[in-house]
Design a protein with these regions (language model features):
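Accessory alpha-helical/coil subdomains and C-terminal extensions
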Residues: 145-221, 228-230, 236-240
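Proline/glycine-rich low-complexity loops and linkers
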Residues: 53-56, 63, 80-176
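Short alpha-helical segments enriched in small residues
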Residues: 235-428
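Glycine-rich beta-strand-to-loop/alpha-helix junction loops that act as flexible
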Residues: 13-15, 70-78, 155-156, 230-231, ...
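Glycine-rich phosphate/diphosphate-binding loop of Rossmann-like nucleotide-binding domains
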Residues: 5-45, 236
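Conserved hydrophobic helix-helix packing surfaces used for dimerization/oligomerization
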Residues: 8-10, 151, 276
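Short beta-strand elements
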Residues: 143-144, 216-218, 372-378
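Glycine-rich oxoanion-binding loops at beta->alpha junctions
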Residues: 31, 35-60, 96-137, 312-349
Length: 428
């Protein structure tokens, strides 16, 4: 296979993508993994489950590209057409592949399922195709050459695709005539916006080196700053840029690579042999969910209390009637008592407690929609802050959950300076 200048195209299939019922995240993942090899996607096409259209598009791609990755259409149903389409474009027949059958037998046996005709459809592959292992799902991938183009077919289920890409990328790397020089460094941040980050860089680092490409990817709750170089000789410049960004953004940087805020918090807690508990009202358990998505979270996360009503705040966490009556559920004394009660009941070292008004209703002149009180810290050393985050309900919950985690991260790291979003989101 030729070097990193090869032309790569993606073909995504499925009516569910065309209709908007499914959001395409797979192409971004594929492009990102290919970028590790210095390979860029120069064209992406999405086509519904139409045989003629799929056949025409794949045929055109194989004439124009060195590598085509097809995503979707590998399952057991009648609208899974990829094997049929590739066989037609390659001018070969369809045959039952023994390795695919063996995979299906093991997959069904492990789940106590019968190996029926619908499942066996997934073993019908283009003649001459090579199986690409799927370590999670029932549908194997497959690949073959069509003329001078290599075609790799992958399943549309995101988790299965992600699991398969490790092997696919390793195989592609072995086939390249020269090792990739492209390097991508990703810095994960919280509390910074794209425009403010760009302005800070422009003001503080006007001599940014041309050989280091700077990019941003906004998300909720994190923002990614991406640095890219295309040749190994630019590695010193990349290191200098990383050091300068770390000095500029400092405590807003969570970590490198794909580090998640919850992952960083758990790592810090594990390193210290300490534990965390959450007490949530307006976020409805989202902080606990973010934490428990991380494997091994039970080593540091003791419990999560979702105390949505005042009655449950009283009964479960011991928030007093007097405090609720005098100050209301969205108040500093209430989140303090929520945090204290949670730590006492879970025997944890640290707590995060949140109570706010997610909207769209429930606001008052004194406490408008978007108002939230956060408490965080250790026993006898709790901190509190009132913020105003007037955004759509689900985004409010995401950002408040992340803010709570961020404050615990800062506490564990001994960071005393306030984050930028404290001044930007200060409630008046």
């Amino acid at each position: 296979m030729q070097d990193r200048d090869m032309k790569v195209q993606l073909l995504l299939t499925g009516n569910e993508i065309m209709s908007g019922d499914t959001v395409d995240s797979n192409s971004a993942l594929i492009a990102r993994r290919l970028g590790e090899l210095g390979l860029g996607v120069f064209r992406k096409v999405t086509v519904g489950d139409e045989v003629a259209l799929l056949r025409r598009e794949l045929a055109a791609m194989t004439e124009d590209a060195d590598l085509v990755i097809v995503n979707g259409g590998l399952g057991p149903t009648v609208d899974d057409l990829t094997a049929e389409i590739l066989a037609a474009v390659a001018g070969v027949g369809i045959e039952r592949h023994p390795q695919a059958v063996t995979h299906l037998e093991a997959w069904c046996a492990g789940r106590n399922l019968p190996l029926n005709d619908a499942n066996l459809k997934q073993a019908m592959l283009p003649a001459g195709a090579t199986v690409v292992d799927n370590p999670i799902g029932s549908a194997v991938g497959f690949e073959m050459n069509v003329g001078n183009c290599r075609v790799i077919c992958t399943p549309g289920v995101p988790g299965e695709l992600a699991a398969m890409l490790d092997g696919i990328i390793a195989d592609l790397a072995a086939r390249l005539e020269r090792p990739p020089e492209r390097r991508v460094l990703r810095l994960q941040t919280f509390g910074l916006g794209e425009s403010s980050a760009q302005q800070m860089i422009s003001d503080a680092l006007p001599d940014w080196p041309a050989e280091v490409e700077l990019g941003f990817r906004a998300g909720a709750p994190q923002m990614e700053i991406k640095l890219t170089i295309d040749r190994a000789s630019a590695e010193p410049a990349l290191r200098r840029c990383r050091e300068r960004l770390q000095a500029l953004f400092g405590d807003h940087i969570i970590g490198e690579g794909d580090t998640l805020l919850a992952e960083r918090v758990l790592q810090l807690l594990r390193d210290r042999g300490e534990t965390l508990v959450t007490a949530e009202s307006c976020t409805g358990g989202l902080i606990a969910s973010m934490l428990t998505r991380i494997p091994g979270s039970s080593e540091a996360f003791h419990a999560g209390f979702v105390t949505y009503s005042n009655a449950v705040k009283r009964a479960v966490l011991g928030v007093s009637d007097e405090t609720l009556t005098e100050h209301g559920a969205v108040s500093e004394p209430v989140v303090q008592q929520m945090a204290e009660g949670a730590m006492a009941r879970a025997d944890a070292d640290y707590a995060i407690a949140v109570s706010g008004i997610a909207g769209p209703d429930g606001g008052t002149p004194d406490k408008p929609v978007g108002t939230v009180w956060i408490a965080w810290g250790a026993r006898g050393a709790l901190h509190t802050r009132r913020l105003l985050w007037p955004v759509e309900r689900s985004l409010f919950q995401t950002m408040i959950a992340a803010a709570g985690l961020d404050m615990i991260r800062r506490t564990l790291l001994g960071i005393d300076t306030e984050p930028r979003y404290f001044s930007q989101r200060r409630a008046r």
